[in-house]
Amino acid sequence: GSALGILASEFKSVSRVLQPINDTLQTMPLFVLLIPFVMIFKIGEFTALLAVMAYAMVPAIRYSEHGLRSVPHEVVEAATCMGCTRWQLLWRVKIPLALPEMMLGLNQTIMFGISMLVIAALVGTSGLGQQVYIGLGDGDFGVGMTAGIGMAIIAIIADRMTAAWSVKLQERYTSNPAS
């Protein structure tokens, strides 16, 4: 998702193609999103993986593109005047400055993916999402809550890990901007 966001920030044509796709994926009900994948790939793990990826990568694309486009024009102009190539400008100036927003996009992608796992249980995944679905279907409060709490714990751990990684990367870029 972040790679597509970087491409979209660098090329307006890519952004124009991705924007309606992202808008559609973001506003489409989760159950409806499963239909085209089931029609093409039938029910199974691969179908669920594709549906989760399609739903979850939208924030990474949006946040990456927005973060890179939000880099102050003065900073870009100064780097260009100092002789930065387009590649150097992207990797040494824009990405380090957009990193907090890009990491927020990664965090949201992980959270969206975890939330989609319960819905993906409808197309044949196994795991905690399926246990939540089974608990719902059977009226087994204990199984559903245990699996739901497990998913919440995984989400909290993932959130803390991406936040710590973001801080670490920010420290790296601010302490040694030439790296």
Language-model features, listed with the residues they occupy:
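Transmembrane-helix boundary motif in ABC transporter permease subunits
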Residues: G1-N22
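Alpha-helical transmembrane segments of multipass membrane proteins
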Residues: S2-L7, L34-P36, I40, A60-Y63, ...
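Short helix-capping/hinge motifs at transmembrane helix termini and TM-loop junctions
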Residues: S9-K12, F41-I43, V123-G124
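Generic hydrophobic transmembrane alpha-helix motif, especially the helices
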Residues: N22-A56
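Hydrophobic/aromatic residues within the transmembrane alpha-helices of Major Facilitator Superfamily
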Residues: M28, I40-F41, M53-M57, S64-L68, ...
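Glycine-rich helix-loop "coupling/hinge" segments at transmembrane-helix boundaries
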Residues: M39, L68, G113-I154, Q170-P177
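Transmembrane alpha-helices
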Residues: A54, W87-A120, G142, T146-A158, ...
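Short cytoplasmic-facing helical segments at TM-TM junctions of multi-pass membrane proteins
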Residues: A60-G105
